[in-house]
Amino acid sequence: MAADLAVNPGQCTLAYWHRPRWQDNGRTSGNSSYFVQALHNAGAEVILNGHEHLYERFAPQTPAGVAGADGIRQFTVGTGGKNRHGLSGTAPRNAQARSSSAFGVLALTLHPTSYDWRFVSEAGRTFTDSGSHPCH
């Protein structure tokens, strides 16, 4: 992966896989630490995960979980419709938005120098999350 990132140094890089690095309960997935480090070294912008049946958006952060402008933003979007997991009582460090109240999808738009996101809830639910962010 690091070699692929090195020969494709474009802005607004997005990566995705199943289990999130940072999770609602404050745990981290050690299995993804190599990927997150390689992506951070390459200046990637976004990680998109599922697995947890909830929605979370984290501030850009380093592989160590320290918020910073040069970090990677993680979205956990496991809200496809099977069931919903409850949220832990305390938001994990750097969590900016989270919900387990609605099924829905995340619309991501990658621009040449920025990206936009918008969580679209199922009919009848009011949770929403949207924004834009510049690329590194």
Predicted feature descriptions by range:
Residues 64-136:
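Binuclear metal-dependent phosphoesterase catalytic core
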Residues 1-73, 135:
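His/acidic metal-ligating clusters that form di-metal
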